[in-house]
Amino acid sequence: MYPVSDAFLRAVRSNTRKYFWTGTIVTRGGMTYEFGAKEIVKGSGYISRQCCGSTEIELGTVYAAEMGITLLSDIDRYTLEDAQVTLVFHLVLADGSVEDVPMGVFEVSEANRLAKCLELKAYDFMLRFDKSFNGFETVGTAYDFIALCCKRCKVEFANKRAEID
């Protein structure tokens, strides 16, 4: 969970609220593209989370997020292979200030051009764990095993040893 203020929680619970989204796309080549509410096609954005790929419970699955968004943009779709999209939700509070909540970093899996629009589909880093791994290669604590998995899958590990051991 991301910590938010009491004012944020009150604003979310109110009958009406003002909010907007912004984001950044960083290509493999290092090009950075910023986008905001003006570039996002209204009603096109979503973030959905799912644990299993089917209707049955499967062992070894992860809780992954999919992000989709359509942008009014002339970015060349071919430059977006494996690009990273960072999304931020901005909520306007009762006093007029804005509180930001980072919504995650996603890797682009599909980029399609529709006239003047760029349609993106991306997944969070949890899908990086979808690979074969021999867990018997290591000996150690739970922390050591998780840290090794994160390193091999190139996923940042945010926990401290004391939180896990």
Language-model segments: which ranges?
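Intrinsically disordered, low-complexity coil segments
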Residues: 43, 93-99
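Juxtamembrane "anchor/assembly" segments of surface/extracellular structural proteins
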Residues: 1-80, 116, 121-129, 135
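Short alpha-helical segments and helix-capping/turn motifs at coil-helix boundaries
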Residues: 54, 72, 90-92, 104-107
